[in-house]
């Protein structure tokens, strides 16, 4: 079974905002997240991930509606648990919602959502969005308690935060095996609880193959590295290269197909 690839196009909007933050609607505003979504599909993406943050640092609300209208790929809408974002989600009606933590100080999402500690605040949001027909994912650290709380709250999916794993691989430190073990245990627990297990954050062309050691993964959500690679080879080719690196995964072995 091939892993599904969700392509996060937020940082296409980041590049646009670097020049057109005050004029995102200008005819000159580029690059276009809509073009990126179209190229992602041509490159083999299975879904498109977008995150409209409260501070609108990259994706704008208008982008979300236009992207959804322009592509027939399912939209995975990342959002903080705020009434503003709930209202946007109810208007946008994406196929998937991924609830994430969000602070203005962070450069990007730096850790998993504390479903255990925020259970009572998150539960009504999950219920509201599911009632409107959306499939819910929780972006969580690979922690057994967070997986169990996500299943208890009724989320159909979890996305395992792979940032610590990615840092350990890049820095060639001894914690690499420990981080993979955390991911393995979290994936097994999610599978046992009947929750779809996805993963994302910090995954790149150099480390993606190491996630073959983690069983029961369904989809990887990858963004920044694809946008960075696209500067050299174009967006469609960057997606296709990542797609090729994700072939041959065996979810039951947690390793390369044998």
Language model: regions and residue ranges:
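Glycine-rich phosphate-binding active-site loops on the catalytic face of alpha/beta enzymes
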Residues: 98-106, 157-170, 216-235
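Histidine/lysine/aspartate-rich catalytic loop segments that bind and position anionic ligands
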Residues: 135-189, 193
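Conserved N-terminal beta1-alpha1 strand-loop-helix module at the mouth
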Residues: 1-77, 88-94, 175-178
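Glycine-enriched alpha-helix->loop->beta-strand junction motifs that scaffold or abut catalytic
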Residues: 44-46, 70-73, 91-97, 131, ...
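N-terminal active-site wall of soluble small-molecule enzyme domains
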Residues: 49-128, 145-146, 160-168, 183-189
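Hydrophobic faces of well-ordered beta-strands that scaffold small-molecule active sites
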Residues: 3-9, 48-50, 75-79, 97-99, ...
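C-terminal helical cap(s) of enzyme catalytic domains, especially alpha/beta-barrels
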Residues: 68, 170-176, 229-254
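Catalytic cores of alpha/beta
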Residues: 83-92, 143-153, 199, 203-217
């Amino acid at each position: 079974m091939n892993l599904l690839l969700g392509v996060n196009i937020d940082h296409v909007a980041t590049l646009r905002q670097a020049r057109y933050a005050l004029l995102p609607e200008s005819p000159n505003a580029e690059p276009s997240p809509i073009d990126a979504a179209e190229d992602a599909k041509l490159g083999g993406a299975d879904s498109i991930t977008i995150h409209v943050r409260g501070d609108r640092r990259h994706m704008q609300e208008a982008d979300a509606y236009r992207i959804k209208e322009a592509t027939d790929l399912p939209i995975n809408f990342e959002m903080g648990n705020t009434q503003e974002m709930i209202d946007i989600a109810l208007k946008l009606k994406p196929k998937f919602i991924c609830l994430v933590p969000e602070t203005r100080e962070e450069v990007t999402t730096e850790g998993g959502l504390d479903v255990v500690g925020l259970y009572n605040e998150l539960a009504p949001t999950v219920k509201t969005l599911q009632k409107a027909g959306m499939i819910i994912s929780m972006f969580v650290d690979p922690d057994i308690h967070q997986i169990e709380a996500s299943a208890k709250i009724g989320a159909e999916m979890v996305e395992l935060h792979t940032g610590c794993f990615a840092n350990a691989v890049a820095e060639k430190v001894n914690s690499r095996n420990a981080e993979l073990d955390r991911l393995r245990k979290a994936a097994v627990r999610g599978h046992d609880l009947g929750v779809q297990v996805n993963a994302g954050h910090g995954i790149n062309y150099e480390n993606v193959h190491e996630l073959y050691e983690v069983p029961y993964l369904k989809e990887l959500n990858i963004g920044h590295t694809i946008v960075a690679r696209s500067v050299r080879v174009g967006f469609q080719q960057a997606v296709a290269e990542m797609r090729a690196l994700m072939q041959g995964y065996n979810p039951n072995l947690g390793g390369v197909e044998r």
